[in-house]
A protein has these predicted regions:
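Short helix/turn-capping signatures at newly exposed starts of structured segments
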Residues: 1-141, 152-154, 159-195
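Active-site beta-strand termini and strand-to-loop segments that position acidic
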Residues: 147-151
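Short hydrophobic/aromatic beta-strand element in the GNAT-like acyltransferase core
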Residues: 144
């Protein structure tokens, strides 16, 4: 299966028993968006993130320019990015989040789980074709696959129940996360009564 054919494995829209529609971003479109952000030459300023948004034809929220609506057809704000201080008044993009499935009413969420599972598998297969084998894990019910790119950008796709989403963490975000993990590991060692 390729990124172009993966979308045929599951329906992009499923009408649920209450009449609501569960939508899944077609794999080809989702993978193109993921790659646009993950393969960007980091660091990325907020202005560069907004320019990438415009190049992709996405629309900012009226209340928060860091939240977008894509043309992927799920009918809601489905993208956001976060920034961190990069020194002085300068900010840099630390992460990007893309929802690959729509929100649906709670009473019918279980109906979407099989479709979400097939979508997750199709996305993992398509991203594996691009980035090679990722690291699979499960934490607190969230099944995820993570790829660390040569740039130290991290791509993480996860699913829990009817939700499928992807996060792209910038190299600077990964460096901060490693530093925090090391700090907390050292604190734990210092506070270990067995030492």
């Amino acid at each position: 299966m390729t990124a172009d054919t993966a979308g045929t494995v599951f329906p992009a829209e499923t009408v649920l028993s209450d009449g609501s529609v569960y939508r899944v971003v077609p794999v080809g479109a989702g993978v193109r968006a993921i790659r646009a952000w993950a393969e960007y030459p980091w660091p990325m300023s907020p202005a560069q993130a907004l320019a990438l948004r415009d190049r992709l034809g996405w629309t900012s929220s009226l209340t928060n320019e860091r939240m977008f609506t894509t043309d992927h057809g799920i009918g809601e704000k489905d993208v956001s990015f976060n920034t961190i201080e990069a020194g002085g008044d300068t900010r840099t993009v630390s992460s990007f989040h893309l929802s690959l499935t729509s929100r649906i009413p709670k009473p019918v969420r279980a109906e979407a789980v099989p479709t979400a599972g097939r979508a997750f598998d199709a996305y993992v297969e398509a991203l594996t074709a691009v980035y090679g084998q990722g690291k699979r894990s499960r934490n607190r019910g969230v099944l995820s696959v993570t790829w660390t790119l040569p740039s130290d950008t991290l791509v993480d796709i996860g699913t829990v129940g009817r939700v499928v989403s992807v996060d792209v963490d910038s190299p600077v975000g990964n460096e901060i996360a490693r530093g925090e993990a090391q700090y907390f590991a050292e604190i734990a060692d210092e506070n270990d009564p067995a030492r």
